[in-house]
């Protein structure tokens, strides 16, 4: 018996180590795919002897005299001013009650049944009540501010720009990631080549991190299992 117990200790230690290693479940990123884009090389212009070459390589290296320099091609950069401030609240309540009472008795009892049902011995009365009262509420608010420079990775058919970008900040033993993607209307871009995040359609903003501090904030899958299984 002692021999089997000695063999059981390594197995138990291996199981504990396995459960500990699988304690952290990685979350699916909100912004997926590449977070940058490279400019598409244009065709080499053919010199026609004129000062102005109409075959400019998709505006690269060409700046109109009376026009602001704004992103319009794949690979151009744009600054997103993060100004997110969202709050929501919800409350609900419900109550219901019901009472009931029933009585049963004999007004007249035959003489030969007086011993059993006489003097209100057969009278019955039942009553019941049921009540319910429930309340619920939820509050949520988030604030996000900052700046992030993104890259145009797609020019849509109507001229809108799909942008995507990422910023990484390494602090001690962890790394913070700020990812952004969305669709920008070129008309909303200011002269400083920036646009508020509130004017970006289909915006995806993600602020996550990795490292032991981030792992300590996540509940293990075994804890989640018992949390969902427990009736308390």
UniProtKB/Swiss-Prot annotation:
Keyword Membrane belongs to the record: yes
Protein name: Flagellar L-ring protein
Gene field: flgH
A Pfam family annotated for this UniProt entry: FlgH
Organism the protein comes from: Salmonella typhimurium (strain LT2 / SGSC1412 / ATCC 700720)
Main location: membrane
Keywords (A to Z) from UniProt: Bacterial flagellum, Cell outer membrane, Lipoprotein, Membrane, Palmitate, Signal
Lipidation (N-palmitoyl cysteine): 22
One GO-annotated biological process of the protein: bacterial-type flagellum-dependent cell motility
Subunit relationships: The basal body constitutes a major portion of the flagellar organelle and consists of four rings (L,P,S, and M) mounted on a central rod.
Phylogenetic lineage: Bacteria, Pseudomonadati, Pseudomonadota, Gammaproteobacteria, Enterobacterales
């Amino acid at each position: 018996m002692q021999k089997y117990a000695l063999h059981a200790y390594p197995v138990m230690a291996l199981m504990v180590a396995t459960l500990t290693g699988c304690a952290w479940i990685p979350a699916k990123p909100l912004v997926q795919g590449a977070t940058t884009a490279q400019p598409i090389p244009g065709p080499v212009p053919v010199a026609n002897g004129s000062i102005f070459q109409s075959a400019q390589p998709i505006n690269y290296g060409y700046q109109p005299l009376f026009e602001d320099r704004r992103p319009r091609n794949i690979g151009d950069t744009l600054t997103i001013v993060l100004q997110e401030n969202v709050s929501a609240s919800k409350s609900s309540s419900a109550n219901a009650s019901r009472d009931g009472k029933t009585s049963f008795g004999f007004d007249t009892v035959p003489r030969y049944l007086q011993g059993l049902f006489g003097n209100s011995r057969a009278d019955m009365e039942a009553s019941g009540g049921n009540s319910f009262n429930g309340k619920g509420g939820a509050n949520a608010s988030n604030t996000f501010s900052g700046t992030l420079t993104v890259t145009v990775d797609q020019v849509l058919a109507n001229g809108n720009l799909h942008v995507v970008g990422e910023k990484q900040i390494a602090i001690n033993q962890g790394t913070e990631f700020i990812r952004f993607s969305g669709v920008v209307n070129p008309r909303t871009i200011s002269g400083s080549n920036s646009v508020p995040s509130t004017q970006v359609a289909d915006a995806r903003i993600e602020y996550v991190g990795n490292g032991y501090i981030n792992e300590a904030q996540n509940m293990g899958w075994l804890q989640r299992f018992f949390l969902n299984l427990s009736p308390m």
